[in-house]
């Protein structure tokens, strides 16, 4: 989920409601507020809580909430809050800013997992923060039963296959790059956490077609998903996702710096 | 300044006081709390304010406060708070996590500079966050008189020279890498913002010797600063800075994950 | 194909013959001498010609010859030589050493394609030399009918999909990374150019099973190919490929620096 | 030295003579044919020998010859040839194309140094080929007295300082980046191997002024060298160096692909 903004750069809850209804309509399995496409680092802790609360109160879909922060105190606070309001799962990437080795990343997750029982997806997105190695994921998974899977947005299929080798009935591996979903399903991925759902149903159709009609799924990937991803990829991430959503829904949306309006045609 | 921690990973104000007194004793010109060595992203907004306030109340040295956050709301809040309590200047790097182009970085600074009058140092540290180009610094400097300089920790001397070309009476360029201070002074740098000051006076002596005794300054660089930086550089940043400080002062200090204790000898 | 070496680091033609017979036995479609696994840059022009000639004279399999060099004169000489001795196709990566933009790469291929009629595969391997963009491949393909396809060893599936979008009856797209062959076939790849063939038939079985028994192919990938690639990947490339081949065939093989013997168990 | 080319992309010896006379006129200490600016990888072994021979026969200046190749046989041949014709020293970077660890690089140099007595400069240029660590340089220096120094073109001052720590009466450390020469001299560099000498005497004047008039040297760096380097840096390397030389001397010069003409104004 993007985090819709008004002309002043504040969260726009009317627009958020439109987004929630759209996502329910195209039949996603989970809502994922405050992820990277939701530009979570651009908001205060209070804004993040308010947004999670609004999504919870306005949808019956299961929710996985982005709880990322380099500060373990903030992560703990967001996890407890999310659990209290009935959110089903949390999604957490390694800390950002300071470059970290795997030992540091392990200490971070261990501390958080030791003080929270909430189901957690580990989020690997090395473009934006420190990479978590499959080996570290494996160790955390073996020590904490609340670690329920991984969302891998690395776009590195070799690394993704290593994550997939950890899959079992209690451990899911999700692809975070829309244009790699078909390939990932072929290799055994549990599903996708995909940003184009904010304004397009192609990726959901691909996912649902896949089981019965592999050829059709591949066709959707090639004809719908890849061209859309290429188009979005020409702009500073994730500004085009917002503009696309605003334009499609005739919303007078805005941007909070460092975000800015880009000229994508829909 | 590191942010000294106790055995539970909370800020240790007794230790902070020891640190302040040491820095005053070796005669630094400014205190710089909540920078990268101070692991500012590992703290909550409240912890950051409390720490800034403590430093302000316990030293008469001028202070430049790290106010970094990807959230402009948090930056604005930290700047207003800092100004209110009498802190002299703020230090701000570009937003982290999402990879940004220069246009995005410009929008971010512009928004913040438009709503704050506090003197600001721009902080370039591309190892940890998006790089700010000298061209963007130049544009911001020409539009906002509150932009008083840049702290460059890139370790890229060619880029540093480009920053130096912006120097004038109202614009200072500081070197953020201790082992490059001598070279930077030769090229015209205004000074350094140097992490080894937390437990060693070599870099301050180098700076003061430089004007009168260039050879002595070079000797300190080669014999004291570079070997110390190499030793510290063997460990996950900035854990060794903390351990060094704890050991030197016989403090039973601690770590907040992702930080952890490393075995440096002092 | 590796380029088998004797204890003095010279090409070992007896061992080469053993290799040719093995490759024929496991039923590869083409032989590919003097590629990256064949460490072509470690040989003189004369050694390269001699090796190509030996392979040509000792096998009736179609051959694609690595003709890479940053010097267009050397490439032209190798292509003419290869064509004269009846080699079916050439494989050529962009020039290495000096970092090049796409315009430079285009000029290089254009010059070579204008003076040679031999069928050519473009070789994308950005780990080792300048990357060639799908757009540049597309331009070369549209101008020169002798451009018959691309070998992509980038391990970047997103880029590979872009290459695949150029596929047609006269343009083949090959995967150069063994552990990505299954995935690539799913996406429509024409086949693979795979280094583990030097001592293992898994990847060939995978390829042949794929058309009739996709599940079996996936099983081979997971049980045979990926574990083998991981094992090989622990050593300085491509030393372990050589040692594996030597040990398997009880050959007293050697290395030419910068190659050296590694301790892989087979 | 660039390698001047005629309109057909062949070496232009008349132009080479003009270049030699110019370099003698501005009083460089050494000629350095077949380095990176000389695009040595774009030539055949015979062309490289012919060029070295021509330079030797047409100048009494000491010469250091670029003998780089990933093939140790080619390096050995070039070194023996150079020694035979009276060239004073060889310059050699680590092998390119295949990514190598330090052990591989060590094996390569060791093999070459064991079979040649010629004085050698190790050439570090990680932008174009595998990086050689100061530690590896140190080991080679301690084992082979023919290792007389290092040319470092990395533009990494921290690494350069590590190379400088190896300096002694028998081991020189040269800066390969013109705009970093002043800084490097300050730190104790032996001198520079600088590409702008092909058409400009600024860097030579800087070097000669440095000993007596440090301020003048710094002025030349800021007013002449840095602006020239910035201008050249806007184009695909090293095309602008060639065009500049051609234009300045009214030579109808050419390019061998992947080189091409760029529109620099002189």
From Swiss-Prot, chains A, B, C, D:
Per its record, how is this protein called by name? 2-dehydro-3-deoxy-D-gluconate/2-dehydro-3-deoxy-phosphogluconate aldolase
pH dependence, per the record?
Optimum pH is 5.5, and 50% of activity is found at pH 4.5 and 7.5.
Instruction: Characterize activity with respect to temperature.
Output: Optimum temperature is 65 degrees Celsius. It shows high thermostability. At 70 degrees Celsius, the enzyme does not lose activity upon incubation for 2 hours. The half-lives of the enzyme at 80 degrees Celsius and 90 degrees Celsius are 20 minutes and 15 minutes, respectively.
- Described function: Involved in the degradation of glucose via the Entner-Doudoroff pathway. Catalyzes the reversible cleavage of 2-keto-3-deoxy-6-phosphogluconate (KDPG) and 2-keto-3-deoxygluconate (KDG) forming pyruvate and glyceraldehyde 3-phosphate or glyceraldehyde, respectively. It is also able to catalyze the reversible cleavage of 2-keto-3-deoxy-6-phosphogalactonate (KDPGal) and 2-keto-3-deoxygalactonate (KDGal). It is equally active with both D- and L-glyceraldehyde.
GO MF, any single term: aldehyde-lyase activity
Q: What is its EC number?
A: 4.1.2.14, 4.1.2.51, 4.1.2.-, 4.1.2.21
| Family annotation (InterPro entries) | Aldolase_TIM, DapA-like, Schiff_base-form_aldolases_AS
Instruction: Give a yes or no for keyword tRNA processing in this entry.
Output: no
Name the protein family.
Belongs to the DapA family. KDPG aldolase subfamily.
Q: Which residues bind substrate?
A: 36-37, 123-125, 151-153
Cross-referenced PROSITE patterns, in alphabetical order?
A: DHDPS_2 (PS00666)
